[in-house]
Amino acid sequence: MSNNLVLVLNCGSSSLKFAVIDAQTGDDQISGLAECFGLEDSRIKWKINGEKHEAALGAFTAHREAVEYIVNKILAEQPELAAKIQAVGHRIVHGGEKFTRSVIIDESVIKGIEDCASLAPLHNPAHLIGIRAAIASFPKLPQVAVFDTAFHQSMPDRAYVYALPYKLYREHGIRRYGMHGTSHLFVSREAAKMLNKPIEETNVICAHLGNGASVTAIKGGKSVDTSMGLTPLEGLVMGTRCGDIDPSIIYHLVHQLGYTLEEVNNLMNKQSGLLGISELTNDCRGIEEGYADGHKGATLALEIFCYRLAKYIASYTVPLGRLDAVVFTGGIGENSDLIREKVLNMLEIFNFHVDSERNKAARFGKKGIITQDKGTIAMVIPTNEEWVIAEDSIKLINK
């Protein structure tokens, strides 16, 4: 364990993920989750030295109390480890066009995150609560913001401008921003290492597949196109999100079927995707079980999920010009050999040949190439967003 430890915080609206990460190795010394904020059964769970712990936070507690518990209880019982924490790194979902890289947090940065809240109304306000709680609990430690959208700021305007009146972009910032940037950045770097190529000469298509999912075309280490848009709703079929649809469906739902706009937003974000198609579950594991049992809804959901993903991967060869590898990551990407095989079989025109044994072996945290030695390469790389946040935090405070 080095002296370059970073406490990484990822604040959601009703939960807080945390980890103490060694910026040199990426190893987590402590990892945990505080959840059910605002409810009677608010709890915190954590793991240290392989041992799992759990405690009640108290009824109706939230981010501030969770951070205080981390400081006054968990870290207080590990004084040697706590003494090596050099910074607090915060994952921030949306930085708009204002933030193109990670930054040390000051009042102007907090104001900038507030200004971007309309682009991520569920996430950015929660991040701000976490930042303020961390500043109160760690007044002497530098705080660093790492933005999911920053990696995609290298996209050319032909990739991020929507075919709407241009003044909507100019005056209101309505454009493609993309998400999962920290994950795509990490995985593309690891892919270059596996390919034994400089990142500047590596072209990959990265599929981050979880309950939220996105694909990014990465050319020479830079994002040149990505599937999520102004918000995380655009692009792939996801657990409960619809991804790409005809925008006129919204008009039809409101004016023909009597939905309110709030109901439409809830339908597209929380009732659609794998859940909506299958009428069974949003969990990919449940979808695969249903598929194996012959469940029609699960089978259709799986086919649409894979087909949409394959189409996106195929289209992203256009901005790359040359494809070195397709990379799967995220909970589904790292663990579903079935989905990987289905998608790559749909991309046979690109000369992918799945090695069944390699594909089945690349699960549960194991990385590796999953195609045969002939043809185009596909690989699995477990993501580690926390490591990127820790690395960026140490680099910034040492400048």
Curated annotation (Swiss-Prot):
Q: Output one GO MF annotation.
A: ATP binding
Q: Note the PANTHER family from the entry.
A: ACETATE KINASE
- List of residues binding Mg(2+): N10, E385
Which residues take part in binding substrate? R91
E.C. number(s) listed in UniProt: 2.7.2.1
The active site annotation covers D148 (proton donor/acceptor)
Q: Which family does it belong to?
A: Belongs to the acetokinase family.
Q: Point out the gene that encodes the protein.
A: ackA
What is this protein's name?
Answer: Acetate kinase
Q: Which domain of life is it from?
A: Bacteria
**Species per Swiss-Prot/TrEMBL record:** Shewanella baltica (strain OS155 / ATCC BAA-1091)
